[in-house]
Amino acid sequence: MARRTKGRNIDGIVLLDKPTGMSSNHALQRVKRIYNASKAGHTGALDPLATGMLPVCLGEATKFSQHLLDADKRYLVTAKLGQRTDTSDSDGEVVSERPLNFTQEALDAALDSFRGDTLQVPSMFSALKYQGQPLYKYAREGKEVPREARPITVFELNFIKLEGDELTLDIHCSKGTYIRTIIDDLGEKLGCGAHVIMLRRTAVAGYPYERMVTIEALEALLEQAEKEGVEPKTLLDPLLLPMDTAVANFPEVNIPDAVAPYLMNGNPVRVAGVSSDSLLRITLGEARRFVGVGAINDDGLLAPKRLVVFYDDEA
């Protein structure tokens, strides 16, 4: 059995509605403490300015968080036109101010240039690393270092409204897309400059928006549990989504109970009628209990890649 760690062995995913002004790591630690979880990890940082969906993986769900990092995201963003900042958002210093002299046709053309497959040069104020150090550390020292343009895809970019100097957009994009950079680049295309004043992540993969929960709501449940004299987990755990929702889009392969011990020890097993080049979601027996992900190896066997560790006293 795996080595015990401090905290509760609780597995699942909390769809946190991160508040503005809080780092993603701080939000993660708050959720971990509330659930008294032994392990926790988030699935893609949001800027402190940003709000919205931050899936927090607890326990064994952390093994599958990478697949949510790789998932598409959706954002609602409001930009202030006419001002450019050094961070491309309202947390930074204004570096230029220019009047708004563009037409609706020019705006439409500029927006269209971001749709589809493009290359994006990441902002210096990002967590990407150069020679082992995050770019934002160089930026804070007034240094600029080389950054390679990275391929991104904007599946949808919808114009919502333009009120005065504030432009609101809805953007559905691939992993690794920096919304701040899109807004900064848009401002330069329009000749007026722009920066983000509101950013909200409304979707990660296919997770339902209505299942998001705030830190305040979680803490209120803790207080309610104390008042009612019940275990906090009785009120908190129903908010968790199953850990296999992180890999819900993977093809399922179901294995019989008889071969489960062999597979769960890390050995490849033979399965009938499966010939996929992609990762597979492995379920066990008639109950279809999720046990991990695997892939078909060169010998045509199902080889486990990441397996769930189950505890006898798992809550």
Swiss-Prot record:
SUPFAM superfamilies associated with the record: Pseudouridine synthase, PUA domain-like
Q: What class of enzyme is it?
A: isomerase
UniProt KW keywords: Isomerase, tRNA processing
The answer to whether the entry has keyword Signal is no
Per the UniProt entry, what is one GO biological process?
Answer: mRNA pseudouridine synthesis
* Reaction equations catalysed: uridine(55) in tRNA = pseudouridine(55) in tRNA
Q: List the disulfide bonds.
A: none
**Where's the active site on this chain?**
47 (nucleophile)
Q: What is its EC number?
A: 5.4.99.25
Q: Which Pfam families match?
A: TruB-C_2, TruB_C_2, TruB_N
- This protein's record includes keyword ATP-binding: no
Q: Sorted alphabetically, which InterPro entries does this protein's record hold?
A: PsdUridine_synth_cat_dom_sf, PsdUridine_synth_N, PUA-like_sf, PUA_sf, tRNA_psdUridine_synth_TruB, tRNA_sdUridine_synth_fam1_C, TruB_C
An annotated Gene Ontology molecular function: RNA binding
Give the record's family classification.
Belongs to the pseudouridine synthase TruB family. Type 1 subfamily.
Q: State its role.
A: Responsible for synthesis of pseudouridine from uracil-55 in the psi GC loop of transfer RNAs.
Task: Specify the protein name.
Answer: tRNA pseudouridine synthase B
